[in-house]
Amino acid sequence: MYYGFDIGGTKIALGVFDSGRQLQWEKRVPTPRDSYDAFLDAVCELVAEADQRFGCRGSVGIGIPGMPETEDGTLYAANVPAASGKPLRADLSARLDRDVRLDNDANCFALSEAWDDEFTQYPLVMGLILGTGVGGGLIFNGKPITGKSYITGEFGHMRLPVDALTMMGLDFPLRRCGCGQHGCIENYLSGRGFAWLYQHYYHQQLQAPEIIALYNQGDEQARAHVERYLDLLAVSLGNILTIVDPDLVVIGGGLSNFPAITTQLADRLPCHLLPVARVPRIERARHGDAGGMRGAAFLHLTD
């Protein structure tokens, strides 16, 4: 059995998957925020419960926001303060007496989708998250590409391409990002960025779901906004696709629930790609809230 943990600032979610990659059981508990020992206990108790329930010693994979292992082997995860700065993988491997695998949550999202029954035919899968922020992951032949610093797939911290400034106007604001840089595409293409663009052009403060509702009602202003957003997404994604050249792009996050993202994006890409480039298949993520657990569990499918 494959145990996958999706760990965030408020909850630890465990999903148990069989050899057919089907979910057999899941359980959630609150994330201890102040005590590392309590955090380790919470994970180990869930593993023990799963072992007893299924009569086996399942493999353990963990998805967590942040950098799973820094150069000294410790975790960097600002949203999980009890474990940040600790050698989480090593400590859990020792306590559980088994190989614990750890990766960031965006890579686990991408891995979950790459192992979808229909998507396993594609060698190179790119996961793109358009949610509170912008991120993602790259999966090659069923394995995540992490890079030396575990920042592969941090697409949101690419800067706006020059064509975007031509499109939006050379006086378009280069917003300061939480990473300290200016002009990161996360600030324009995330759910928050989607709302900011609307406010910037129309001087009305609406949230993304409200704008999308207006779009669906045929509101001309909302439709013009969505056209502009999709053009900006296409020119930004075009740069990424030129470097990565994936077979499949799977889009997750809150904005993936807006059908125009996946149905209209492909037609806008060719003018931003090399003439010989082929537009990859673009699909909405299929596994929703279970994706983090699935991807973490499937870290052990990559042997």
Swiss-Prot record:
Entry-linked SUPFAM superfamilies: Actin-like ATPase domain (SSF53067)
Annotated metabolic or biological route of this protein: Cell wall biogenesis; peptidoglycan recycling
Reactions catalysed according to its record: N-acetyl-D-glucosamine + ATP = N-acetyl-D-glucosamine 6-phosphate + ADP + H(+)
Chain's role: Catalyzes the phosphorylation of N-acetyl-D-glucosamine (GlcNAc) derived from cell-wall degradation, yielding GlcNAc-6-P.
Listed InterPro entries: ATPase_NBD, N-acetyl-D-glucosamine_kinase, ROK, ROK_cs
Positions contributing to Zn(2+) binding: 157, 177, 179, 184
Any Pfam family the entry gives: ROK
EC number: 2.7.1.59
Organism: Shigella boydii serotype 4 (strain Sb227)
Binding site for ATP: 4-11, 133-140
GO MF annotations, alphabetized: ATP binding; N-acetylglucosamine kinase activity; zinc ion binding
Residues spanning the signal sequence: none
NCBIfam families: PRK13310.1
PANTHER family reported for this sequence: N-ACETYL-D-GLUCOSAMINE KINASE, ROK (REPRESSOR, ORF, KINASE) FAMILY
Protein name in UniProt: N-acetyl-D-glucosamine kinase
Gene: nagK
